[in-house]
Amino acid sequence: YIADIDRIMACKKDGEEVWAKDISDTLLKIDVQGPLAFKLLKEVYGENVLKNRYNPEKNMNFFTFNQFERNGQHYYLSRTGYTNRWGWELYIPVAVAEEDAKIIISKALDFGGLLVGLGGRDENRISAGPFGLPLMGQEYDPYHTPVNAPLFETAVDMNKEYFVGKEGLVKEIAEGVQKRLYIFVSEGIVTNRGIYKEGK
């Protein structure tokens, strides 16, 4: 896959002064998802970090980011919700990651939550059906586009004058869609394996 930083720089228009720095090695990411995610983060980090930075009377909008300082450390927070519930992705400085993770996990267990890996998160995300969000490397990758998804027209406004990738989508639609993405519900675990019918 093309690294995120390469994707960002590829969108730079001629003459624009844009720079990007990869700081991923300095951060640890924890997803806090579910109906009590807001309460948990509010108790650990305070309500202000969850506010809309452009309208502090409201909470963060879906797919927005905040930054905040805590004990001299710089954090990033994104409002997500891959499971069609309240959710955030918290980017914690490596220097305090172990300490913060222990606090978050302890608080989650106090609330009756669970500590799960990516498999558990993916199961909840897929169970959300059309409301579960796709992930890079799982449902989409450089070899698939939004056009391949059944609900493409409801998610992408092709009437919008410009967006990154529009030219490619217009071309794909004109040439005829060759692939479709679908969800298969199976019995048992079939991760990273094909789905067979009559041995094929």
Q: What residue ranges belong to the model's regions?
A:
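Conserved, structured C-terminal
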Residues: 1-200
